[in-house]
């Protein structure tokens, strides 16, 4: 549902959640489900993690066969900072074992060659504070066959605390010939445009900056084209929330997620705290839609009194 909202908002590519190569190998239905396109979803970039080359080769081939032309790329996650991942040598821990990382990339590149699917890598500044590995590591991934590298400007030990160091993105962009994707602290469309202009990145990866604002992608494109960025009105934002909730219901997701979605879509609206409280009582699609209908009624009354809501 999140991916479909992002694509509708102008995103060129949407990624799956991280999928374990071992999970795919041992037949976990839950793992394979993560690699599937939802109904109405045009295509997908699938994000894999693990440490075994043979499992990466098997996973990449399996995903390519299942998705066919809907597979945009395979991304190898070497950026995840979560301890349960890094303690197994996976995710950001791979930045400390570049030879293994090269082998994983090569395995995927070889497996996907018959399908014409590119392999990309996502990395961080490094694993440990003060030990920047990204530029040299990116060069090695390029030599192994990666066709793009996404760079998050924090160390793994920082998780998502502190500020992302965009100069790291710039240094990586200067170190490789393949496209670099900038990531980290891209909170709105203006920051996305600034990331491109200041770092030499060829693309921007946006996550938290799109929460409650799936239009951020088109807004960034507007800014780069010298246009006034699209500014959704309050009613448009509520209608987007309704659409997001219907998508969640359609894929059978737990609808309590709607409570956190409401927090994001309602941010900055009049009486937002009250309406968040109402949304936090909801458990079904019908209940969420009733709350959103009440919000729109309140907005219509406000408009009658001269307040702009569109």
Segments from the language model and where they lie:
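Alpha/beta enzyme core
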Residues: 8, 57-90, 97-178
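Pocket-edge positions in alpha/beta enzyme catalytic cores
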Residues: 48, 92-96, 161, 229, ...
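Hydrophobic faces of well-ordered beta-strands that scaffold small-molecule active sites
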Residues: 14-16, 44-48, 74-76, 119-123, ...
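Glycine-rich, positively charged N-terminal anion/phosphate-binding segment
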Residues: 1-69
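Alpha/beta catalytic cores of nucleotide-metabolism and tRNA/nucleoside-modifying enzymes
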Residues: 1, 8, 118, 130-148, ...
């Amino acid at each position: 549902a999140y991916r479909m909202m992002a694509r509708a908002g102008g995103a060129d590519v949407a990624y799956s959640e991280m999928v374990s190569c071992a999970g795919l190998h041992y037949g976990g239905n839950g793992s394979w489900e993560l690699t599937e396109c939802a109904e109405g979803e045009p295509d997908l970039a699938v994000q894999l993690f693990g440490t075994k080359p043979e499992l990466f080769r098997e996973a990449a081939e399996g995903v390519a066969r299942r998705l066919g032309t809907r597979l945009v790329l395979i991304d190898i996650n070497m950026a995840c900072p979560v301890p349960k991942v890094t303690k197994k040598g996976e995710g950001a821990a791979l930045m400390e074992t570049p030879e293994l990382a090269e082998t994983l990339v090569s395995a995927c590149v070889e497996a996907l060659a018959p399908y014409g699917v590119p392999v990309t890598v996502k990395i961080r500044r490094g694993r440990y504070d003060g030990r920047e590995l990204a530029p040299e590591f990116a060069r090695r991934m390029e030599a192994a066959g990666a066709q793009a590298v996404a760079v998050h400007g924090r160390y793994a030990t920082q998780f998502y605390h502190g500020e992302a160091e965009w100069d790291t993105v710039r240094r990586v962009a200067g170190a490789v010939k393949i496209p670099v994707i900038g990531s980290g602290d891209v909170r709105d469309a203006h920051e996305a445009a600034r990331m491109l202009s200041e770092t030499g990145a060829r693309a921007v990866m946006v996550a938290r900056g799109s929460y409650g604002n799936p239009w951020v992608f088109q807004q960034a494109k507007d800014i780069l084209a010298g246009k006034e960025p699209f500014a959704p009105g309050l009613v448009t934002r509520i209608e987007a929330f309704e659409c997001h909730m219907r998508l969640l219901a359609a894929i059978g997701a737990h609808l309590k997620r709607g409570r956190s979605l409401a927090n994001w879509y309602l941010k900055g609206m009049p009486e937002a705290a009250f309406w968040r409280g109402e949304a936090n009582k909801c458990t079904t699609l019908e209940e969420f839609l009733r709350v959103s209908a009440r919000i729109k009624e309140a907005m219509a009354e406000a408009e009658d009194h001269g307040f702009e809501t569109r």
